[in-house]
Swiss-Prot record:
InterPro entries: Amidase, Amidase_CS, Amidase_dom, AS_sf, GatA
Family named by the database record: Belongs to the amidase family. GatA subfamily.
Keyword tags: ATP-binding, Ligase, Nucleotide-binding, Protein biosynthesis
EC number: 6.3.5.7
Domain of life: Bacteria
A GO BP annotation: translation
Function summary: Allows the formation of correctly charged Gln-tRNA(Gln) through the transamidation of misacylated Glu-tRNA(Gln) in organisms which lack glutaminyl-tRNA synthetase. The reaction takes place in the presence of glutamine and ATP through an activated gamma-phospho-Glu-tRNA(Gln).
Catalytic residues of the enzyme: 76 (charge relay system), 151 (charge relay system), 175 (acyl-ester intermediate)
GO CC entries: glutamyl-tRNA(Gln) amidotransferase complex
Gene3D superfamilies for this protein: Amidase signature (AS) domain
Enzyme class, spelled out: ligase
Name of the protein in its database record: Glutamyl-tRNA(Gln) amidotransferase subunit A
Catalyzed chemical reaction(s): L-glutamyl-tRNA(Gln) + L-glutamine + ATP + H2O = L-glutaminyl-tRNA(Gln) + L-glutamate + ADP + phosphate + H(+)
């Protein structure tokens, strides 16, 4: 059961071969056994989860169930959930109990899925390794000396270790795709605006997007069917006709034009990642796809552009955490200004402070034009590069991460190397394009490698189809970390 797909779990539940209460109990027991070592979950509430499971069993018994009713899911701790501790991986919110549900949480509740708990993450989603969390680092289930990636590292670890059949994540510059690659699972960041951000604690509002993480592309399609939809409470939410992302999964990919950006296959990619990606592309050739070289000349500037714009937005978004309304509050202070300073100094970790400082600097008088405005112009050029590339191809493919997972602690004192983990993912984020990662093999030390698939706007169905056809021909997505296969 722990290795079952969402459809298989749905069949077991609908045929009464297992109840949601029993299924949820099995996952809770597994979390209890393995989480002390992996640290994938921050918060669990067994009684709340089992209450939801009992409600799901009633829905199934009375014929009110959906395909996902009764199936457990883990929620990234960036999503507000009514009555749940919602920390965003920070001391600043270590005592915050959310009084309402994020739209994403509510959507899964409405179809009868069961919330297993809140997963660990980089503090305020700022990080590529899940080492900035106030609750400690998450370990990669394939090699517990390695990072799981970030910022959705807890969600990626939970799915890879079979602590949950699915999880939610968020992606600002690669935070779904990079941990999915490093943990050997599938994850998708939809087109910006397709999934509601209401109740999702903001990092960089023009980049943040929620998406699902699971073992396979088919599972992602089922989850995306629930998550995508217009929400009037989110000013950036897009009003589009509802789409069934499972409809074209089985379609052959013969004739699919795959663009290979020369900038993604240049220096910087490790040889083990290159070998696994080349083997995956060879599999697509066997499936009938054709390849065309494309160019994204401004993508080499994506990381510096991202690390100007995202911190600028974070500087503004995180100004609300001041010790007055909610969250951490300094115990001793001389006056109001001192309260703000001490609360933020105590409540935020070093990486969050670094990005607030960068963001405040680039927005300040005298530097706004030189940095922020220039970065916005380059963002537009990056989007134009993708527009030209998609005139020649249907999808763009390349590596998700330049290396396999690095060791915990290895890059903590080298922020530049840490930021370069997003070198292949941040360009699509800046353009607002959908991107996904699927497992395509292993590199050094038997650590997973991911293939990055970028689609044109609203082409999630085409991306999922291409990923699913690859997964029908291979079994990388079915593999379980050896020490977790029990």
């Amino acid at each position: 059961m722990l290795n079952a797909s969402l459809r298989q779990l749905s069949s077991l539940l609908s045929e009464k071969k297992i109840s949601s209460t029993e299924l949820t109990g099995e996952f809770l027991a597994r979390i209890k056994a393995l989480n002390p070592d992996l640290n994938a979950f921050i918060t669990m509430d067994e009684e709340k989860s089992l209450d939801q499971a009992r409600t799901a069993d009633e829905m199934i018994a009375t014929g009110q169930s959906t395909l996902l009713t009764g199936i457990p899911i883990a929620q990234k701790d960036i999503f507000c959930a009514n009555g749940w501790l919602t920390t965003c991986g920070s001391k600043m919110l270590s005592n915050f109990i959310s009084p309402y549900d994020a739209t994403v949480v509510k959507q899964f509740d409405q179809v009868g899925m069961v919330n297993l708990g809140k997963t660990n993450m980089d503090e305020f989603a700022m990080g590529s390794s899940n080492e900035t969390s106030y609750y400690g680092p998450v370990k990669n289930p394939w090699d517990r000396l390695a990072v799981p990636g970030g910022s959705s590292g807890g969600s990626a670890c939970a799915v890879a270790a079979r602590l949950a059949p699915a999880a939610t994540g968020t992606d600002t510059g690669g935070s779904i795709r990079q941990p999915a690659a490093l943990c050997g699972i599938s994850g998708i960041k939809p087109t910006y605006g397709l999934v509601s951000r209401y109740g999702m604690i903001a990092f960089a509002s023009s980049l943040d997007q929620a998406g699902p993480m699971a073992r396979s592309a088919e599972d992602l399609a089922l989850l995306l069917n629930v998550m995508v939809g217009f929400d009037e409470r989110d000013s950036t939410s897009l009003q589009r006709e509802k789409e069934d992302y499972t409809q074209d999964l089985e379609k052959p990919v013969s004739g699919l034009r795959i663009g290979l950006p020369k900038e993604f296959f240049a220096e910087g990619m490790s040889s083990d990642v290159s070998s696994a990606v080349e083997a995956a592309l060879a599999e697509y050739r066997k499936l009938g796809a054709t390849f065309v070289e494309v160019s994204l000349p401004n993508s080499k500037l994506a990381v510096p552009v991202y690390y100007v714009l995202a911190p600028a937005e974070a500087s503004s978004n995180l100004s609300r955490f001041d010790g007055v309304r909610y969250g951490h509050r300094a115990a001793q202070y001389a006056n109001l200004e001192d309260l703000y300073a001490k609360t933020r100094a105590e409540g935020f970790g070093d990486e969050v402070k670094r990005r607030i400082l960068i963001g405040t600097y680039v927005l300040s008088h005298g530097y706004y034009d030189a940095y922020y405005l220039q970065a916005q112009k380059l963002r537009r050029l990056i989007a134009e590069d993708f527009k030209k590339a998609f005139e020649q191809c249907d999808l763009i493919m390349g590596p998700t991460s330049p290396t396999v997972a690095f060791n915990i602690g290895e890059r903590c004192n080298d922020p530049i190397q840490m930021y370069l983990s997003d070198i292949y993912t941040s360009a699509a984020s800046l353009a607002g394009l959908p991107g996904m990662s699927i497992p395509v093999g292993f590199g050094s030390k038997n650590r997973p490698v991911g293939l990055h698939i970028i689609g044109n706007y609203f082409r999630e169905a085409q991306m999922l189809n291409a990923a699913h056809r690859y997964q029908l021909a291979t079994n990388w997505h079915e593999l379980t970390p050896p020490e977790m296969n029990r």
